[in-house]
């Protein structure tokens, strides 16, 4: 078994780490989403009859530990009863969050398509909306490090499903925000107001920015919860600060605008990655073949949906 390596920050500039380090932890669904009840039921059902005592478990592409939190909260996992459990992810910031919440977890900053573990190291490997981002090689690596009598359980994004539709709606709004060029107009307007510019030039800057605000207001009206509610926050806070600029330091406002732009850009990149990595029938079969190619294993595939009236949102893959 490989030993856990100290967290390092050399990967801080990758887009995956940007999502965890610079943005709010906004997933494709939020804590109130109907999908969450389905996910909780799935994991509770799978682990209710399984004893993990003295077993070794790997949460691959763990992110900030959302799956681990679900399992612990539902008493599916008692960390102190496990022989070892690892959270592996590319993001330093995400793993730091895992370690702060679950000190017993061994965190490993690594490319999940190149796991530094010996063959047949783990009894259980789990993932929720993570492994598919790492490509087919990550499934092959899981097959390699999973014991012959072990169990692999993963929830993966379903192509053309409910979450993908939500991602596409979010992207459409963010592309529209980019077309408005809102942040550039906002910076010019705040600077002009702070410098107490007068005359036609200042009036033009103010009018242009107010038009941009109106356009964002229209986006918010049509999609009030877009980008995890960040677009609504951007509109409300920017408008308030502009109308009450004497109460704020302009440099602090400009810094806030930069951070908001980074956050929305990183959220947009996250949505794009999600669309690119969601599995269709062909890619799902290739993922399963990673386990069956080197020996006979039992495979169970389920399709998860919030209810019969909604599109599926995820594949549930079990190998045992």
Explain the meaning of each model-derived region.
Residues 149-158:
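Conserved beta-strand signature within the Rossmann-like core of class I S-adenosyl-L-methionine
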Residues 133-142:
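A short, conserved alpha-helix within the catalytic core of class I
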Residues 56-114:
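Class I SAM-dependent methyltransferase SAM/SAH-binding core
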Residues 167-197:
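Conserved Class I S-adenosyl-L-methionine
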Residues 113-125:
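A short acidic, Gly/Pro-enriched loop at the edge of an enzyme's catalytic core
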Residues 186-297:
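Substrate-binding/catalytic lobe of Class I Rossmann-like enzymes that use SAM or dcSAM, i.e.
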Residues 303-320:
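Core SAM-dependent methyltransferase catalytic element
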Residues 2-48:
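Class I SAM-dependent methyltransferase Rossmann-like catalytic core
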């Amino acid at each position: 078994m490989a030993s856990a390596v100290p967290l390092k920050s050399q990967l801080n500039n990758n887009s995956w780490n940007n999502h965890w380090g610079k943005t709010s932890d906004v997933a494709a669904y939020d804590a109130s989403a109907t999908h969450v009840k389905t996910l909780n039921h799935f994991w509770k059902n799978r682990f209710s009859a399984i004893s993990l005592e003295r077993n070794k478990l790997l949460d691959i592409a763990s992110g900030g530990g959302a799956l681990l939190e679900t399992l612990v909260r539902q008493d599916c996992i008692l960390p102190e009863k496990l022989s070892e459990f690892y959270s592996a992810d590319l993001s330093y910031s995400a793993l730091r969050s895992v370690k702060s919440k679950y000190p017993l977890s061994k965190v490993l900053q690594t490319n999940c398509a190149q796991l530094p573990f010996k063959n047949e190291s783990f009894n259980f490997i789990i993932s929720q909306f993570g492994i598919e981002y790492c490509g087919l090689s990550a499934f092959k690596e899981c097959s390699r490090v999973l014991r012959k009598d072990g169990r692999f359980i993963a929830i993966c994004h379903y192509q053309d499903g409910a979450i993908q539709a939500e991602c596409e709606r979010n992207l459409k709004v963010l592309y529209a925000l980019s077309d408005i060029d809102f942040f550039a107009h906002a910076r010019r307007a705040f600077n002009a107001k702070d410098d107490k510019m007068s005359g036609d030039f200042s009036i033009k800057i103010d009018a242009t920015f107010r038009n941009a605000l109106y356009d964002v207001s229209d986006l918010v009206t049509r999609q009030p919860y877009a980008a995890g509610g960040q677009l609504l926050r951007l509109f409300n806070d920017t408008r308030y600060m502009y109308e009450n600029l004497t109460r704020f330091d302009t440099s602090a406002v400009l810094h806030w605008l930069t951070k908001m732009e980074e956050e929305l850009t990183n959220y947009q990149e996250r949505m794009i990655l999600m669309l690119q990595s969601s599995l269709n029938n062909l890619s799902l079969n290739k993922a399963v073949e990673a386990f069956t190619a080197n020996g006979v294993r039992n495979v169970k595939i389920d399709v998860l949906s919030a209810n019969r009236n909604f599109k599926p949102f995820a594949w549930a893959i079990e190998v045992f």
